[in-house]
């Protein structure tokens, strides 16, 4: 969506080549897949396909060990990383190795697994439905919590022989964790600790332009966005990332457009990596996922998707209205980091969440941080990642 703003500006002022400054050095990872990005930096990579109970085929990636500890071939503690909304596993590996959480954990001795939610670039297959069908896209974060997380975590536990794993979630990755671990006690028992970055349980106070979407009637949202994909990665995104936003005079425009949706923290964004960030983002989701977030923004509650009528809700939930999720039912030990300039996971929403967490181990608010700083900030290792490594080692 913010990319469209950039495109409009380019159209108004004419062409990206030459006029807006010379092109910066290109990073080859911008055009790589997940496994290629991992091996490019000298780390081992494994790729798996996990089939969910309802037939979705998820791409799951593994970094079994780091460059510094390859000689230790015994069992390692497992760290599972789950991305946020319209994102993918690449979020954890798009910075340099000393600034990317997946690589940092691998070098710290962890068996690192990267998940992908249904519908994104690396999980766009189903046993029964084609991605061209409406049926394929009839999901939101409800199904990610109900089917994707259990299938992926069970696969990892079986593959590694570890009974419990560490779970790191960002943005919507925390949302599906809250839902899955509060409604599925058997799954919750497999989680050592939950590390929540920019946690989202409610969006009552969000100031993001996405809030405006909640004011649009649902029937009109369907007219505007359709009933299939929302913000899939395409050629335009790739072009903007590799040919436009990497130009000296346009990186500021691109970063400001991004900040409008996620909050401002100009000094912490590595603009030299813009082509990698935009070469893999947005990674897409369903329009139903978008509609679900609009529903939450309007209600201010964490609630299952409203299928539109009492009859449809009865078919899905055996009740006329969508059930609410009770975060306080989650007993998994949790550590929380949030940003003071995050307009998606607003500090007021986080303040509402914290008292509901019965096993809160740690909370830190980083005042300058926006929503994306937790995955891309240049000082993320000092502010967040080193603390995660320390806490994992203590458990």
UniProtKB/Swiss-Prot annotation:
<dbReference type="GO" id="GO:0016615">
    <property type="term" value="F:malate dehydrogenase activity"/>
</dbReference>
<dbReference type="GO" id="GO:0005739">
    <property type="term" value="C:mitochondrion"/>
</dbReference>
<keyword id="KW-0378">Hydrolase</keyword>
<protein>
    <recommendedName>
        <fullName>Gastric triacylglycerol lipase</fullName>
        <ecNumber>3.1.1.3</ecNumber>
    </recommendedName>
</protein>
<dbReference type="GO" id="GO:0006108">
    <property type="term" value="P:malate metabolic process"/>
</dbReference>
<feature type="domain" description="AB hydrolase-1">
    <location>
        <begin position="81"/>
        <end position="376"/>
    </location>
</feature>
<comment type="function">
    <text>Catalyzes the hydrolysis of triacylglycerols to yield free fatty acids, diacylglycerol, monoacylglycerol, and glycerol. Shows a preferential hydrolysis at the sn-3 position of triacylglycerol.</text>
</comment>
<dbReference type="GO" id="GO:0016042">
    <property type="term" value="P:lipid catabolic process"/>
</dbReference>
<keyword id="KW-0325">Glycoprotein</keyword>
<keyword id="KW-0442">Lipid degradation</keyword>
<feature type="active site" description="Charge relay system">
    <location>
        <position position="371"/>
    </location>
</feature>
<keyword id="KW-0443">Lipid metabolism</keyword>
<feature type="active site" description="Charge relay system">
    <location>
        <position position="342"/>
    </location>
</feature>
<keyword id="KW-0964">Secreted</keyword>
<dbReference type="GO" id="GO:0005576">
    <property type="term" value="C:extracellular region"/>
</dbReference>
<feature type="glycosylation site" description="N-linked (GlcNAc...) asparagine">
    <location>
        <position position="33"/>
    </location>
</feature>
<dbReference type="InterPro" id="IPR029058">
    <property type="entry name" value="AB_hydrolase_fold"/>
</dbReference>
<dbReference type="GO" id="GO:0004806">
    <property type="term" value="F:triacylglycerol lipase activity"/>
</dbReference>
<keyword id="KW-1015">Disulfide bond</keyword>
<dbReference type="InterPro" id="IPR025483">
    <property type="entry name" value="Lipase_euk"/>
</dbReference>
<dbReference type="Pfam" id="PF04083">
    <property type="entry name" value="Abhydro_lipase"/>
</dbReference>
<comment type="similarity">
    <text>Belongs to the AB hydrolase superfamily. Lipase family.</text>
</comment>
<dbReference type="InterPro" id="IPR006693">
    <property type="entry name" value="AB_hydrolase_lipase"/>
</dbReference>
<keyword id="KW-0732">Signal</keyword>
<feature type="disulfide bond">
    <location>
        <begin position="245"/>
        <end position="254"/>
    </location>
</feature>
<feature type="signal peptide">
    <location>
        <begin position="1"/>
        <end position="18"/>
    </location>
</feature>
<feature type="glycosylation site" description="N-linked (GlcNAc...) asparagine">
    <location>
        <position position="270"/>
    </location>
</feature>
<feature type="active site" description="Nucleophile">
    <location>
        <position position="171"/>
    </location>
</feature>
């Amino acid at each position: 969506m913010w990319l469209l703003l950039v495109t409009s500006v380019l159209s108004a002022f004419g062409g990206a080549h030459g006029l807006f400054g010379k092109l910066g050095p290109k990073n080859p990872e911008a055009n790589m897949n997940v496994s290629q990005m991992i091996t490019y930096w000298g780390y081992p990579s494994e790729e798996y396909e996990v089939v969910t109970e309802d037939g979705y085929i998820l791409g799951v990636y593994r970094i079994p060990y780091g460059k510094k500890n390859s000689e230790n071939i015994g069992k390692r503690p497992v760290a599972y990383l789950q991305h946020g909304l319209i994102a993918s596993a690449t979020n954890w590996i798009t910075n340099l190795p000393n600034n990317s959480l997946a690589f940092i954990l691998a070098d710290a001795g962890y068996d690192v697994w990267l998940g992908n939610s249904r519908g994104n670039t690396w999980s766009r297959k189903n046993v029964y439905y084609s991605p061209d069908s409406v049926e394929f896209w009839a999901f939101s974060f409800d199904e990610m919590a109900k089917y994707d997380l259990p299938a992926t975590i069970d696969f990892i536990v079986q593959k590694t022989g570890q009974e419990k794993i560490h779970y790191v979630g960002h943005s919507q990755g925390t949302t599906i964790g809250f839902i899955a671990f509060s409604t599925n006690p058997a799954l919750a028992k497999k989680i050592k600790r939950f590390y929540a970055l920019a946690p989202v349980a409610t969006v009552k106070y969000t100031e993001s332009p996405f809030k405006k979407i909640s004011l649009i009637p649902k029937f009109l949202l369907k007219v505007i966005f359709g009933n299939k994909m929302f913000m899939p990665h395409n050629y335009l995104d790739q072009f903007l990332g590799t040919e436009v936003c990497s130009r000296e005079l346009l990186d500021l425009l691109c970063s400001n457009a991004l900040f409008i949706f996620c909050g401002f923290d100009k000094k912490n964004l590595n603009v030299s990596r813009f082509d990698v960030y935009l070469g893999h983002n947005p990674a897409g989701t369903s329009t139903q996922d978008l509609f679900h977030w609009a529903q939450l923004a309007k209600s201010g509650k964490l609630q299952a998707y409203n299928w539109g009528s009492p009859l449809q809700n009865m078919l899905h939930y055996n009740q006329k209205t969508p059930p609410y999720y009770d975060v306080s039912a989650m007993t998994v030990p949790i550590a929380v980091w949030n940003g003071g300039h995050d307009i998606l996971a607003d500090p007021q929403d986080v303040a509402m969440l914290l008292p509901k967490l019965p096993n809160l181990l740690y909370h830190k608010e980083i005042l300058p941080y926006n929503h994306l700083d937790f995955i891309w900030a240049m000082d993320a290792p000092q502010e967040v990642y080193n603390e995660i490594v320390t806490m994992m080692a203590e458990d």
